[in-house]
Amino acid sequence: MNDSQDKIVAIVPAAGIGSRMGAEIPKQYLLIDEKTILQLTLELLLTHPKIDCVVVALHPEDQFFKGLPLSSHHKLHTVVGGSERADSVLACLNHLGGDCWAMVHDAARPCLTHGDIDKLIASRQRFPQGAILAAPVRDTMKRGNADGTVKETVCRERLWHALTPQLFPAALLKGNLEQALAQGANITDEASAMEWAGVSPGLVDGRVDNIKITHPDDLLLAGLFLGNAHSLER
């Protein structure tokens, strides 16, 4: 890889309102130990030595981001996001210049570790098409009926929980996202856009504590994970 192809830009779609949290402010601005979720996530990305810069997609009426201590960080850029995650990611990709790798990470996953980022970056040698962090399914899986009863047990062999970051060549991801959205495809993450285009992303085994904060109980759990991580660092 040449220098420009080796450049890594982190993309953080943070334009959502997080309605499932039942909070008055977007979930990325809720606090864990006196820091917002978004602050914790951005700190993790900005301090990784192999990430050149971070682009954050914000809601057009966001009133909270400028209050973050790192909002003016020299490696941090912002764009106006869209109504859906894919629209926000595409806005960030349009902001990028040149040939690089796009590492897309959920704003509500503050428990990511530098070690997992290292593993994902290293996977480019094995998966030049791109890869995602993922965790093998360990629990018994059930498919349900519409009435809330069990329909059947699903074989968990070769099933993975998709996590983030997800790392792809930026130009390839941008092109596939644009085409998929134009065709009305249901794009739930970056890997699904690549799959839609016939690309099979690599799977990189990630830590199960890299949770996405979606419900109120997740705040406490994330705080425990982050506290344990800090204890281990000391």
Swiss-Prot record:
One protein family per Pfam: IspD
Keywords (A to Z) from UniProt: Isoprene biosynthesis, Nucleotidyltransferase, Transferase
Reactions catalysed: 2-C-methyl-D-erythritol 4-phosphate + CTP + H(+) = 4-CDP-2-C-methyl-D-erythritol + diphosphate
Superkingdom: Bacteria
Biological processes per GO annotation: isopentenyl diphosphate biosynthetic process, methylerythritol 4-phosphate pathway
EC code(s) of this entry: 2.7.7.60
GO-annotated molecular function: 2-C-methyl-D-erythritol 4-phosphate cytidylyltransferase activity
Site for Positions MEP for the nucleophilic attack, residues: R156, K212
Claim: Transmembrane is one of the keywords in the record: no
Site feature Transition state stabilizer, where: R20, K27
Metabolic or biological pathway: Isoprenoid biosynthesis; isopentenyl diphosphate biosynthesis via DXP pathway; isopentenyl diphosphate from 1-deoxy-D-xylulose 5-phosphate: step 2/6
Keyword Nucleotide-binding: no
Record's function text: Catalyzes the formation of 4-diphosphocytidyl-2-C-methyl-D-erythritol from CTP and 2-C-methyl-D-erythritol 4-phosphate (MEP).
Family annotation (PANTHER family): 2-C-METHYL-D-ERYTHRITOL 4-PHOSPHATE CYTIDYLYLTRANSFERASE, CHLOROPLASTIC (PTHR32125:SF4)
Family of this protein: Belongs to the IspD/TarI cytidylyltransferase family. IspD subfamily.
Descriptive protein name: 2-C-methyl-D-erythritol 4-phosphate cytidylyltransferase
Organism: Shewanella sediminis (strain HAW-EB3)
Protein's gene: ispD
